C-alpha cells in the first residue's frame, strides 16, 4: 500500500498519485482525516479557511493497548467488557478472546490519560498499565505474554482519534468541508455538520458525498443540506407559512449565530 501524495484535477477528470502509480477517475470522494489531508498536494489548492482548519482543528487524544496473557487471571464473574473505569489512568477496559488459547485485554486510553502517557516509550507505557492492573488482579504480571500498541495521537495518518472542536473552532470551521472542491467531495466524521466525531457522522458524510458526486456527474450544482434554507431564513424576518418547508437544522445553526 502506498500513501496518496497528490490529487490533480483537470477539466474532464482527476488524477490521484499513490507511490509510483497514478489512478484516474471522473470524481473523487476524499475520506481521510485532516492530518492525512494536509500531506496531500491538491491542485487546485484548498481554500485559505480549509488550510487553516488543517492546522488548527483539534483532534481527541486516543491510544489503544492490547495486553496478551497466557491465561485469564480474572474470575468468571468479572465483567471487563467496557465496564471498568479507573482513576489510575487505565481508561476503559475490554476482554478480547485470543485465537489460540490465552486471553487478551484491550485498554482504551483517551483524553488526559493518553496525553500523559505520550512521555513514555511503548514498554514503559505497558509497565505502567500492568502496575495499575496488578493491584486489581495480582496474578496478572505473572501471566503476561506480550502486547501491541496503537498510538492514534502520534500517528501521522490520523493525528488523533476523532474531531474535537476547541474554543472558537466551530465558528471558524463548521461546515467548510461540505462544499466539494471542483471534482473532489470530502467525507469522514470530521466533515459532518451535526454529528462530528461519531460513526453516524461518518455515515452521513458518505451519503452526502455520494449525492454530491451524483449531482456533479449530472451537471447539477451540489446542494448543501440545510444551507439554502438557512440563508433564506436569515433574510426573512416574518414567520414561515404553512406552505413553506421548514429547515430541520435551523435550531442547531442558530446556536452559532
Predicted regions, residues:
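Central beta-strand plus flanking loop segment that forms part of the substrate or channel wall
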Residues: 49-77
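Flavin (primarily FAD) binding-site architecture
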Residues: 28-49, 66
Amino acid at each position: 500500500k502506498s500513501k496518496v501524495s497528490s490529487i490533480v484535477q483537470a477539466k474532464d477528470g482527476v488524477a490521484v498519485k499513490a507511490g509510483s502509480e497514478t489512478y484516474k477517475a471522473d470524481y473523487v470522494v476524499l475520506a481521510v482525516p485532516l492530518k492525512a489531508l494536509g500531506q496531500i498536494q491538491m491542485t487546485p489548492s484548498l481554500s485559505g479557511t480549509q488550510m487553516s482548519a488543517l492546522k488548527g482543528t483539534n483532534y481527541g487524544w486516543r491510544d489503544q493497548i492490547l495486553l496478551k496473557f497466557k491465561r485469564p487471571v480474572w474470575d468468571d464473574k468479572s465483567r471487563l467488557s467496557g465496564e471498568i473505569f479507573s482513576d489510575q489512568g487505565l481508561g476503559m477496559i475490554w476482554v478480547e478472546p485470543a485465537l489460540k488459547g490465552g486471553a487478551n485485554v484491550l485498554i482504551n486510553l483517551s483524553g488526559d490519560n493518553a496525553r500523559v502517557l505520550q512521555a513514555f516509550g511503548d514498554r514503559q507505557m505497558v509497565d505502567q498499565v500492568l502496575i495499575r492492573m496488578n493491584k486489581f488482579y495480582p496474578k496478572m504480571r505473572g501471566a503476561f505474554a506480550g502486547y501491541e500498541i496503537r498510538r492514534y495521537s502520534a500517528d501521522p495518518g490520523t493525528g488523533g482519534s476523532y474531531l474535537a472542536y476547541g474554543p472558537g473552532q466551530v465558528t471558524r470551521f463548521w461546515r467548510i468541508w461540505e462544499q466539494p472542491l471542483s471534482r473532489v467531495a470530502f467525507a469522514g466524521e470530521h466533515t459532518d455538520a451535526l454529528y462530528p466525531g461519531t460513526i453516524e457522522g461518518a455515515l452521513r458524510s458518505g451519503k452526502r458525498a455520494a449525492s454530491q458526486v451524483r449531482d456533479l456527474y449530472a451537471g447539477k450544482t451540489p446542494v448543501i443540506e440545510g444551507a439554502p434554507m438557512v440563508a433564506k431564513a436569515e433574510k426573512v424576518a416574518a414567520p414561515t407559512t404553512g406552505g413553506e418547508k421548514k429547515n430541520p437544522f435551523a435550531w442547531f445553526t442558530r446556536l452559532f449565530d
